[in-house]
Regions:
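Gly/Ser/Thr-enriched, mixed-charge loops and adjacent short helices
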Residues: 1, 110-173
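An N-terminal, well-structured beta->alpha segment
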Residues: 1-62, 154-173
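Short, glycine-/Ser/Thr-/acidic-enriched flexible segments
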Residues: 8-10, 15-17, 52, 80, ...
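Catalytic-loop motifs flanking and including active-site residues across diverse enzymes
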Residues: 23, 27, 81, 126
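Ferredoxin-reductase
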Residues: 40-117
Length: 173
């Protein structure tokens, strides 16, 4: 499964050419490497997901990879629309956002879209920089992860929800 300009999108399944926890972890490790090179770890990453199969699980896999790299993950407590993720990235002052979604694709698909600190999908030079970092992750053993409770205890995994919802709704009124 190849990381493109909008991220990943593919059929769910076991293999390196499918969407699964391993491809999500690899993409996130590449994103984490890029964020670390940008000195953006302290800003954190907001993560949202949709109602597709395994979206909540992929959201957690991404968050735990970020946390293992010392990057705080702000994870929505349930599914949220893409515009709210964009808002959350800006509201929380994050360097990036991840949306676990395959958008308009068929139900057997899922995806992984990356947003930058302006709340928009990644554009040059960040898109090519992140793609290069993802492609550079060739050793699966180099992909970091950690236990969820350890990430919470370390302050690197924070659940978000109503406070962002309220601010988002107030902003778009």
């Amino acid at each position: 499964l190849k990381f493109g300009t909008a991220g990943l999108r593919g059929i769910l399944g076991a293999c390196i050419n499918r969407m699964n926890m391993y491809t999500v972890r690899k993409a996130t490790q590449g994103l984490a490497n890029y964020i670390l090179k940008q000195n953006g770890a302290e800003k954190g990453v907001a993560i949202a997901y949709d109602s597709r199969h395994f979206s909540p699980e992929f959201s957690d896999e991404a968050a735990l990879c970020l946390a293992a790299n010392g990057i705080k993950a702000y994870v929505f407590d349930s599914l949220r629309p893409t515009p709210e993720l964009s808002f959350a990235v800006r509201q929380l002052g994050c360097i990036s956002g991840i949306n676990i979604t395959a958008s308009h694709n068929k139900p057997q698909y899922n995806g992984y879209k990356v947003y930058w600190e302006d709340g928009a999908q990644i554009t040059p030079p960040h898109d090519t920089g992140i793609m290069a970092e993802v492609e550079a992750v060739s050793d699966w053993a180099s992909v970091k992860t950690m236990e969820k409770q350890a990430a919470i205890d370390a302050g690197l995994y924070q659940v978000i929800g109503a406070e962002i919802d309220d601010a988002f709704i107030e902003t778009i009124k």
